[in-house]
């Protein structure tokens, strides 16, 4: 569960390393975000000489959470870290690679480009 002020790792090669969540996008007063939800975040740590700089406000989609995700089959899945992929206004990733596993639920939320770039889909 991701809320305001939560720090996330960046799971792509866009140049950012750490994000801090400013707002969870959704319907109404959406307090918490889970896998597949879009967030507005600020870049807290970035690599030098890359297009995304520190203190940039970006849009991202959550791909991993430490909070267990309950599936309809009864299985629950949990990751080791909270991570997000930076996206543009159309919902496509800004980077060209995605690092680490991502959840299958991203395909249901129409983030097929992120799923196809990921090395492992759980």
Swiss-Prot record:
Domain of life: Bacteria
Keywords: Ribonucleoprotein, Ribosomal protein, RNA-binding, rRNA-binding
GO molecular function, one term: structural constituent of ribosome
GO cellular component: cytosolic large ribosomal subunit
Keyword Ribonucleoprotein listed: yes
One Pfam family, short name: Ribosomal_L14
Keyword Isomerase: no
Gene Ontology terms: biological process: translation
InterPro entries: Ribosomal_uL14, Ribosomal_uL14_bac-type, Ribosomal_uL14_CS, Ribosomal_uL14_sf
Family note: Belongs to the universal ribosomal protein uL14 family.
Subunit structure: Part of the 50S ribosomal subunit. Forms a cluster with proteins L3 and L19. In the 70S ribosome, L14 and L19 interact and together make contacts with the 16S rRNA in bridges B5 and B8. Can interact with ribosomal silencing factor RsfS, which may inhibit ribosomal subunit association.
Record function comment: Binds to 23S rRNA. Forms part of two intersubunit bridges in the 70S ribosome.
PANTHER family found in the cross-reference section: 50S/60S RIBOSOMAL PROTEIN L14/L23 (PTHR11761), LARGE RIBOSOMAL SUBUNIT PROTEIN UL14M (PTHR11761:SF3)
Full protein name: Large ribosomal subunit protein uL14
